Amino acid sequence: MSIILGIDPGSRITGYGVIRQNGRHLQYLGSGCIRMSEKELPGRLKQIYAGVSEIITQFQPDVFAIEQVFMSKNADSALKLGQARGSAIVAAVNADLPVYEYAARLIKQAVTGTGAADKAQVQHMVMTMLKLPARPQADAADGLGVAICHANTNKTLIALAGKATGARRGRYR
């Protein structure tokens, strides 16, 4: 049994989802968004770090999973997203959590069955898979999707005993 924290990073809104995996069973523990009120990027990065640290303290996860940066036509946006990811990863590393990274297409495929799913499809499937009473906010659903992807990939990793799956794992120290 493990508690998985999934993060959908963003420089303005960072979504998170926390689930408990017990074998094949997934249980919803919490989700939400860290909304940045600071106007300047350094202040927003500090808010991401503090917010993720608070979530880690509250839920005590065993594992941290985060979406990888995808290539964007706007280089500035991709750089800001990378910095937001870095702030969240540092919070996980400071808590001695193993960090796993997943591509957006892999996350969508794990949740919906197709890597080309839109946000509404991800929201609907997350709601269905976790038996939620209502559709979660889009960024929170994406955070839950990252956690679900890790839970499914982790089962596959165990089954394949370390063969390549497209997931990256690391302990950043």
UniProtKB/Swiss-Prot annotation:
Pfam families: RuvC (PF02075). Binds 2 Mg(2+) ion per subunit. It catalyses: Endonucleolytic cleavage at a junction such as a reciprocal single-stranded crossover between two homologous DNA duplexes (Holliday junction). The active site is at D8, E67, D139. Keywords: Cytoplasm, DNA damage, DNA recombination, DNA repair, DNA-binding, Endonuclease, Hydrolase, Magnesium, Metal-binding, Nuclease. Mg(2+) 2 binds at E67. Its main location: cytoplasm. Its EC number is 3.1.21.10. GO terms for cellular component: cytoplasm; Holliday junction resolvase complex. Belongs to the RuvC family. The RuvA-RuvB-RuvC complex processes Holliday junction (HJ) DNA during genetic recombination and DNA repair. Endonuclease that resolves HJ intermediates. Cleaves cruciform DNA by making single-stranded nicks across the HJ at symmetrical positions within the homologous arms, yielding a 5'-phosphate and a 3'-hydroxyl group; requires a central core of homology in the junction. The consensus cleavage sequence is 5'-(A/T)TT(C/G)-3'. Cleavage occurs on the 3'-side of the TT dinucleotide at the point of strand exchange. Homodimer which binds Holliday junction (HJ) DNA. The HJ becomes 2-fold symmetrical on binding to RuvC with unstacked arms; it has a different conformation from HJ DNA in complex with RuvA. In the full resolvosome a probable DNA-RuvA(4)-RuvB(12)-RuvC(2) complex forms which resolves the HJ. This is Crossover junction endodeoxyribonuclease RuvC. It comes from Aliivibrio salmonicida (strain LFI1238) (Vibrio salmonicida (strain LFI1238)).
